[in-house]
């Protein structure tokens, strides 16, 4: 799932399914109630109008922009993400998808920084040692029992 504030930051999270029960908690954690949100016509967004000022673009009807209502900002980000993955990594592991999303979110969110500012920000965020175990387990909820069962 992904959201982006116009002119602002993108926030991303791997979710199991794009349905109401996964999308709405993601929105609640990341978007203030009463905010304007603009989505496509995916059924998962049908009832978000109760918590947000919701406007929909109907891509199925070839509608892409209606005044200030559009989803071009997040679609631009998904395009950058896909090109970045294909051009840099070619293939990514589903196990590490959240890590890749966070890398590209950092790049997007620091798009107006100079290279020196981006480097300083990255260093300030990484002021502690990370173990290999933590690096490879990020975002995963696998127990030892589950890992053994998969082998």
Task: Indicate residue ranges for each PLM-predicted region.
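Residue-level recognition of single "structural anchor" positions
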Residues: 1-151
